Amino acid sequence: MIHLLRGQAFEIEGYTFFTMGGASSHDIADGILNPYADDFEERYWFMRRMRCRFRVNHYSWWKEELPSDEEYAEALKTLERIGWAADYIVTHCAPDRIVKKLNPSYTLDRLTTFLEKIRRKAKFHYWLFAHYHDNRIIDERYVLLWEQIVQII
C-alpha cells in the first residue's frame, strides 16, 4: 500500500503519478457543529430532525479537507521538478472545466481553480478523480471513479 500525499509525484512501475487530494464539503450549508459544546447533543438531534445539511468537527468534517498554502506551494514545486508532465494525475475533485461539464450548478472553489491551472499547463495521459459519486469518462482523458476499481498499470 502506498499513501499518495498531496502535491507529490511518484514513479510506480515506470509511470509517473502526480497527486493532489482534497475537496470542499458541499453538505455543510447549515453549519459545522462543535462536539464539545454544552448544547451539542440537543443541537445535533434538532438538526437531524430538521434534515439540516451539517457536519461535526473532527468526526465528519476537518478543516484539512482542503490543501494548505504550503501544500499548494509544494504541488507547484513538484510540477516544476517533473516538467509539468505525468502519465497520471490523481485528485479527489476535478478541475473547473470538468466540474462544469459534470453539472453546471456545481460550485467552483480555490482547489478546483488550482486544478484547472494544472489542467491547462500539464501534459498527462489520464486524470483520475472521484468526489462526484458517479462513474464516467469525460473528454476521453478524465476518469471519474466512484464504485469502480480500475487497473491502470
Region locations from a protein language model:
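Short His-Asn-centered micro-motif
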Residues: 6, 20, 91-92, 129-131
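Short secondary-structure boundary/capping segments
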Residues: 8-9, 80
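Conserved beta-sheet core of the metallophosphoesterase superfamily
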Residues: 94-153
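Beta-strand-turn-beta hairpins that frame and shape the catalytic cleft
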Residues: 9-19, 88, 138-143
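Generic structural microfeature
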Residues: 12, 84, 122-123
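Glycine/small-residue-rich loop that forms an oxyanion/phosphate-binding "nest" at active or ligand-binding sites
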Residues: 1-5
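Short, flexible micro-motifs
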Residues: 10, 24-25, 133
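Active-site-proximal loop/helix segment associated with metal-binding centers of metalloenzymes
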Residues: 15-105
